[in-house]
Curated annotation (Swiss-Prot):
Keywords: ATP-binding, Kinase, Nucleotide biosynthesis, Nucleotide-binding, Transferase. SUPFAM superfamilies: P-loop containing nucleoside triphosphate hydrolases. Phosphorylation of dTMP to form dTDP in both de novo and salvage pathways of dTTP synthesis. The keyword Nucleotide-binding applies. This is Thymidylate kinase. Pfam families: Thymidylate_kin. It catalyses: dTMP + ATP = dTDP + ADP. ATP binds at residues 16-23. InterPro entries: P-loop_NTPase, Thymidylate_kin-like_dom, Thymidylate_kinase. It comes from Akkermansia muciniphila (strain ATCC BAA-835 / DSM 22959 / JCM 33894 / BCRC 81048 / CCUG 64013 / CIP 107961 / Muc).
Length: 206
């Protein structure tokens, strides 16, 4: 079984280990698409819903077991798809997400759950992205950027980030767009647009 909802819009996901600048580049793309008078819906995961708040709280109050995390992520994503993602795609909007189930594959995969099992569980109900913009930077650069913003969470160690990055690197699909994000913001934005222009030449110019 897989997502069978109506799909007139496009789903673009920004992924990467912490410190890659996902929110910055989602903002650039949103502005570009809105200037073309397209409807854009921007969101993130985990959400601010009931299940997402539990996941966020766990990062502060103490980690849940990986099995508990997986269960909560699936509940949060089901609600997200039903309430926001699917309706937006059905009416023709461009949906831009800061993280999606590839992050779950990477982060919970790094804690011992088979990433392909996670992928299969999600694709039973969640729409496959039209494009994933994987902002890739070396772990050392990510740690430097994270250090500049303050406290780290449980995954923000060299070993943790390296494990997550290796999962992202293992995903091979036509919609997976690797972007070298170890550069200035304007240069990375140009690389993102060029990659997306090849995926959506009728809408996005290089």
């Amino acid at each position: 079984m897989s997502f069978t909802g109506e799909r007139k819009g496009r789903l673009i996901v920004f992924e990467g280990i912490d410190g890659t600048g996902k929110s910055t580049h989602i903002g650039h793309l949103r502005k570009y698409l809105e200037e073309k008078e397209l409807e854009v819906v921007q969101s993130f995961e985990p959400t601010r819903g009931r299940w997402g708040r539990m996941l966020r709280d766990s990062a502060v109050t103490g980690r849940l077991s990986v099995e508990e995390e997986v269960a909560l992520f699936l509940k949060d994503r089901r609600e997200h798809v039903k309430m926001l993602i699917a309706p937006a795609l059905a009416r023709g909007a461009w949906v831009l997400l800061d993280r999606y189930y590839l992050s779950m594959m990477a982060y919970q995969g790094a804690r011992g759950i088979d990433p392909e099992v996670i992928r299969a569980a999600n694709e039973e109900f969640a729409p496959v992205p039209d494009a994933v913009v994987w902002l890739d930077i070396p772990v050392s650069v990510a740690l430097e950027r994270i250090g500049n913003r303050g406290e780290r969470d449980a995954f923000e160690t060299e070993a943790g980030l390296a494990a997550c990055r290796s999962v992202f690197a293992s995903v091979h699909a036509p919609w997976m767009l690797r972007i070298d994000a170890d550069a200035g913001k304007e240069e990375v934005a140009a690389r993102v647009r060029k990659a997306l222009s090849m995926r959506f030449p009728d809408v996005i110019g290089a």
